[in-house]
């Protein structure tokens, strides 16, 4: 609350509602671990006692979207799995934030093929990207601090309740704007469709044309 609060010499602080609530929310984040591949091992290390994520109030991993407000997507994501992740994201209450952990979650990484989504920002509004393959637990701590800074400086609980800004955060889907949120474009395949000819067409084709002498 530094910079926005101050003592008046009588033993109490004067501050704004936004500043106080954002300070409390930033120090009590409840991560939702979405471990999809090898980056999840490093996320387990981040949650262990060595790195002491309890200093930031985020030591309690929540495996229920109803109790979480921070999703950490760790690993590459297939098109089939993206629908399940989007449903879990929609079940999380506002306000909520998202971290794309690792190169695969951020850009698809080395899995540049038809079955892998090239970055989870195709169906989720990502707030912080973490590079690396896999990233170290220290990088996850740094991303968590970036989320805390974003909450303190950018989120406004007054605007959220008055104007509903949190619900305006639509998924980034530039090529699929006319689709239901979370529904991705299926890989395009070249198919050849053969249609059976009609009976009249078959009869005409079987009748030889007269040849002039």
UniProtKB/Swiss-Prot annotation:
Gene Ontology process terms (BP): aerobic respiration; electron transport coupled proton transport
Output the SUPFAM superfamilies linked to this UniProt entry: HydA/Nqo6-like (SSF56770)
Gene3D superfamilies cross-referenced by the UniProt entry: 3.40.50.12280
The Swiss-Prot or TrEMBL record lists the needed cofactor(s) as:
[4Fe-4S] cluster
UniProt binding sites for [4Fe-4S] cluster? 38-39, 104, 133
A Pfam family hit:
Oxidored_q6
Which transformation does this protein catalyse, written as a reaction? a quinone + NADH + 5 H(+)(in) = a quinol + NAD(+) + 4 H(+)(out)
* Entries under InterPro entries matching the protein: NADH_UbQ_OxRdtase-like_20kDa, NADH_UQ_OxRdtase_20Kd_su
**Leader sequence residues:** none
Q: Give me the Gene Ontology terms describing cellular component.
A: plasma membrane; respiratory chain complex I
Acidic residues composition bias: residue spans: 197-206
Main localization (coarse): membrane
Q: Which UniProt keywords apply?
A: 4Fe-4S, Cell inner membrane, Cell membrane, Iron, Iron-sulfur, Membrane, Metal-binding, NAD, Quinone, Translocase, Transport
Q: Which GO terms describe its molecular function?
A: 4 iron, 4 sulfur cluster binding; iron ion binding; NADH dehydrogenase (ubiquinone) activity; NADH:ubiquinone reductase (non-electrogenic) activity; quinone binding
- Region Disordered: what ranges? 172-213
Q: According to its UniProt record, where is this protein located?
A: Cell inner membrane
Function of the protein:
NDH-1 shuttles electrons from NADH, via FMN and iron-sulfur (Fe-S) centers, to quinones in the respiratory chain. The immediate electron acceptor for the enzyme in this species is believed to be a menaquinone. Couples the redox reaction to proton translocation (for every two electrons transferred, four hydrogen ions are translocated across the cytoplasmic membrane), and thus conserves the redox energy in a proton gradient.
In which family does this protein belong, per the annotation? Belongs to the complex I 20 kDa subunit family.
Q: Share what the entry says about its subunit structure, partners included.
A: NDH-1 is composed of 14 different subunits. Subunits NuoB, C, D, E, F, and G constitute the peripheral sector of the complex.
| Protein name from the UniProt record | NADH-quinone oxidoreductase subunit B
Native species of this protein? Answer: Salinibacter ruber (strain DSM 13855 / M31)
